[in-house]
């Protein structure tokens, strides 16, 4: 026998001997019997990554050398809530045209070509209460990519032909506002919950879009775009010290006044409880059921999150999904969500889409599940399942350095409680069956529910022969209102 053959045989014998005890371990009868050690995970601390540049810009920064990439994501203190009356859409155009409209030294076409050459992805947008801008590039191209990115932010061209194209596209999109029942439902649900004057319901019109010119974009940009008005989340393949030097240099020439940005007006006004019906010739009706809830600083948010997961937020294991979809087969998608607002209260919303004839019956089933979770304690098994799921999936919030930095930047912008992430799992772990029932009783108030039904109202009213339920029977206080569709260009009702 050759020497290498003897060595191989000896190695195999040793391997078999070592493997024998493992093979002797009992095999679990099912995956449920598998045992795992608890995952030891502590979220990163924001203060370990927070830096203030000389110009006042806040930066959350972390090295991540897993790929040769760099990410810079900015949050800018601005928003469409700042649109002047009669020029709704100005903030949105300012955000989109930052990227699409060129820079001081580059036409829009040259900017496109430059970014393609650098293999850099750049974006910008402005939403209701914040603006954003992002750069993702190869670490080898960082210097040139960052230079172009900062010029775009500081000295946008807002090229006239690109703005004209964006204006024309916006007007064309307006024509489609009533084409999709899902779009109608989402739009009108927000108005029913918070009212026409809420910052989230400032609709663009054909008149407001036509009133916006290049000078308006320049003035809006000049007023709100300054380094001290930005928070950056930076991660990637770099030396932290070197990256901070690059950021200091890139933004050094930008004037640093911090504008007094008006605060968001949180005022809201819900419609009266009842059933609100909107006619749309579609084979399936869309239904939203809910009410305004609490802000993010409420001590009840943890119990409400768990309550909603049990009721309709956890997919096939949740009560609404199981009852409406799995047991009755009335909807492909049915569930609920619970949001917690930063400026105004968030909301609870249960929703589904069902055949017209079964809309009322499905709505009755959802309301019955709401009643049950108020009046009957959830089971210990339901509670533990949801608590364990929330605790075990918690680390995924911080799956990458980039995600973590973005969370810290968002928290700084919205002033989230500093201990939220460090205390989250303990607060979830401490919840009891009584806590869940308490918040259900306090916040899911049947007499205050709003029901929005979008679909073929004649078919919906005919109902299901096996389950002859009428929407009028479900209306809180017996109130029923028919809402006509808005004119897509003026957003006025006839």
What is each model feature region?
Residues 100-106, 136-167, 314-315, 339-397, ...:
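M16/insulysin-pitrilysin zinc metalloprotease superfamily fold
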Residues 169-188, 266-285, 322-331, 376-427, ...:
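Short acidic/His-enriched helical or mixed secondary-structure segments at domain edges of catalytic enzymes
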Residues 26-29, 34, 231-295, 453-494:
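An aromatic/glycine/proline-enriched structural segment found at the starts
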Residues 80, 288-292, 312-354, 407:
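A structural supersecondary motif
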Residues 31-51, 190-230, 262-267, 394, ...:
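Histidine-acidic residue clusters that define the catalytic metal-binding segment
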Residues 73-136, 199-203, 314-330, 342:
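M16/MPP (pitrilysin/insulinase) zinc-metallopeptidase core fold and M16-derived inactive scaffolds
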Residues 9-20:
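Bacterial N-terminal signal peptides
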Residues 26-31, 106, 111-220, 266, ...:
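Acidic/histidine-enriched segments that form metal/cofactor-coordinating
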């Amino acid at each position: 026998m050759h020497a290498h053959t003897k060595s191989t045989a000896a190695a195999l014998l040793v391997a078999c001997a070592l493997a024998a005890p493992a093979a002797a371990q009992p095999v679990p009868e099912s995956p449920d019997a598998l045992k795992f050690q608890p995952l030891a995970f502590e979220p990163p601390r924001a203060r370990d990554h927070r830096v203030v540049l000389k110009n006042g810009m806040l930066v959350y920064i972390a090295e991540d050398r897993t790929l040769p990439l760099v990410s810079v994501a900015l949050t800018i203190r601005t928003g469409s809530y700042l649109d002047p009356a009669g020029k709704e859409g100005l903030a949105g155009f300012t955000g989109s045209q930052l990227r699409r409209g060129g820079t001081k030294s580059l036409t829009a076409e040259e900017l496109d070509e430059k970014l393609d050459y650098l293999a850099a992805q750049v974006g910008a947008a402005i939403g209701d209460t914040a603006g954003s801008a992002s750069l993702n590039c190869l670490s080898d191209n960082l210097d040139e990519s960052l230079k172009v990115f900062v010029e775009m932010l500081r000295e946008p061209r807002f090229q006239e032909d690109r703005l004209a194209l964006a204006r024309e596209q916006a007007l064309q999109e307006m024509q489609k506002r009533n084409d999709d029942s899902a779009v109608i439902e989402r739009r009108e649900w927000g108005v029913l919950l918070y009212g026409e004057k809420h910052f989230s319901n400032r609709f663009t019109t054909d008149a407001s879009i036509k009133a916006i010119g290049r000078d308006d974009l320049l003035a809006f940009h000049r007023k709100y775009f300054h380094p001290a008005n930005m928070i950056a989340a930076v991660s990637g393949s770099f030396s932290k010290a070197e990256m901070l030097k690059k950021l200091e240099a890139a933004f050094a020439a930008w004037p640093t006044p911090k504008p007094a940005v008006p605060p968001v007006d949180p005022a809201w006004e819900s419609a009266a409880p009842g059933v609100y019906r909107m006619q749309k010739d579609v084979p399936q009706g869309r239904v939203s059921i809910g009410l305004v809830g609490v802000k993010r600083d409420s001590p009840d948010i943890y119990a409400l999150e768990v309550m909603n997961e049990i009721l309709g937020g956890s997919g096939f294991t949740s009560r609404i999904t199981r009852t409406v979809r799995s047991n009755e087969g009335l909807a492909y998608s049915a569930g609920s969500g619970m949001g917690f607002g930063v400026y105004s209260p968030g909301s609870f919303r249960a929703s589904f889409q069902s055949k017209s004839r079964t809309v009322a019956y499905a709505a009755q089933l959802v309301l019955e599940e709401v009643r049950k979770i108020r009046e009957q304690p959830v089971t210990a098994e339901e509670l533990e399942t949801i608590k364990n799921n929330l605790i075990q999936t918690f680390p995924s919030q911080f799956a990458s350095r980039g995600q973590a930095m973005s969370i810290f930047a968002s928290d700084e912008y919205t002033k989230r409680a500093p201990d939220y992430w460090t205390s989250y799992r303990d607060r979830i772990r401490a919840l009891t069956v009584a806590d869940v029932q308490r918040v259900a009783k306090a916040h899911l108030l049947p007499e205050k529910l709003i029901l929005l039904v979008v679909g073929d109202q004649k078919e919906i009213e005919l109902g299901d022969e096996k389950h002859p339920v009428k929407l009028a029977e479900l209306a809180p206080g017996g109130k029923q209102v028919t809402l006509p569709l808005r004119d897509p260009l003026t957003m006025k009702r006839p």
